[in-house]
Amino acid sequence: GEYYLTDAVRLLIERGEKAGACRADSAEAVLGANDCLQLAELNRIARGKIMAAHLLEGTEIPCGDGVIIGPDVSIGRNVTLLPGTILRGKTSIGPNCVLGPNTVLTDCAVGRGSVLNSVQGNGCTIEPGQAVVPYTVMTGKAKTDKK
């Protein structure tokens, strides 16, 4: 069967075990997900913490609507992320780039000063200083020209 944490404490005490308490750093630290609504709330909290860390490091996100940054993404200074930008996997963004709107990158490397508008990328490399035209799809070992 399934037990809630409060049930487990009671059962342990009834068996003669010791129980104690500890203080959580925040109310968010003890939240759980028993349904889709609670899971969505936990996801919102996690995404917010990741976004806040990048904002404090100099990433500009003028409108966070639809901006999702994965936990393993690295972003250089002075990068702008526009609405609908989703960065996943081991994606790395060099400094002074503009991504979005509606750019989705997974496991990509974007060089310094590049501009990507409505680009889909998976495992690709964007050389520094590139302006990738809207609706470009890059997969696998695709690489932009250095020119």
Regions from the language model: what does each represent?
Residues G1-K147:
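Left-handed beta-helix
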